[in-house]
Amino acid sequence: MRKEWATYLKLALEKLLTDEATLAKMSFRVIENVLKFKKQSEELISRVFLEKEDHDNFKLALREALEHSLNLNSNQSAEFMAKYLDMHLKKSPASNSLESEQDLRVVIADVINVFRYVKSKDVFEEFYARSLSRRLLLKKSATREAE
């Protein structure tokens, strides 16, 4: 059963990361979708598997699937993560409202949890530094503390 679960996870994550419609319109949504999928999978594992050993085996399959899928094109995954964080760390020009500090911390923690699996950390750093400097120079940063 674990093998089928692992296969399903890999296929579903690969589909999320290669969805042409999402990639063409809003690439940052790819990471949002991956984070939602990860959360839903973790909740499912917690509800279904009450024994620690089973729970741990299926969580391991999820981690392996994330690592495999995010590194199929790790440069692209790292870029999308930087764009996703940039979107949340900017002031919203349309509504002029900021995300609450708690929401922002949750987003950052979620991205960090997935970032561990990406091998191209240097690519992420490059894109993040570029967007950080742009936010700071244009004074579009939502909060200095989060930066």
Predicted ranges, named:
Residues 1-147:
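Eukaryotic scaffold/interaction segments
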